[in-house]
């Protein structure tokens, strides 16, 4: 199952840090990069931050929605869910995007 237009699925994840926890959160998020890039169906997985280094953005590109769904069941993702407690402020956001065919 891919996106409705048959193209890979893009996900933008916004994660805002609790004040004073920016570096700790950055370390936790950075540990996700290597194992995620090795997952089946992962085309791209990149971490960015804003100029204040208090908000982080993952750019994810997956071959199919099934690959993205499988990502949330991996040991490293489950570890992230536990490790981010107390580091992440409210106001995070996940946005699924589909490429527009032209």
Show which residues each predicted segment covers.
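Glycine-rich beta-strand-turn "strand-cap" elements at beta-sheet edges
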Residues: 1-7, 46-53, 80-102
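Short, well-ordered beta-strand segments in beta-rich or mixed alpha/beta enzyme
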Residues: 9-16, 46-72
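Surface-exposed coil/turn segments at beta-strand junctions on protein surfaces, enriched
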Residues: 4-6, 18, 38
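Short, surface-exposed ligand-recognition loops at beta-strand->loop->(often short) alpha-helix junctions
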Residues: 16-22
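A general secondary-structure boundary signal
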Residues: 25, 39, 53-55
């Amino acid at each position: 199952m891919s996106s409705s237009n048959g193209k890979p699925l893009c996900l933008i994840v916004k994660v805002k840090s609790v004040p004073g926890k920016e570096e700790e959160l950055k370390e936790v998020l950075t540990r996700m990069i290597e194992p995620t890039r090795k997952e089946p169906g992962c085309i791209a997985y990149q971490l960015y931050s804003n100029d204040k280094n208090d908000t982080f953005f993952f750019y994810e590109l997956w071959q199919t929605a099934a690959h993205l769904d499988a990502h949330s069941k991996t040991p490293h993702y489950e570890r992230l869910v536990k490790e981010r407690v107390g580091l992440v402020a409210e106001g995070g956001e996940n946005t699924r995007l589909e490429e527009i065919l032209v």
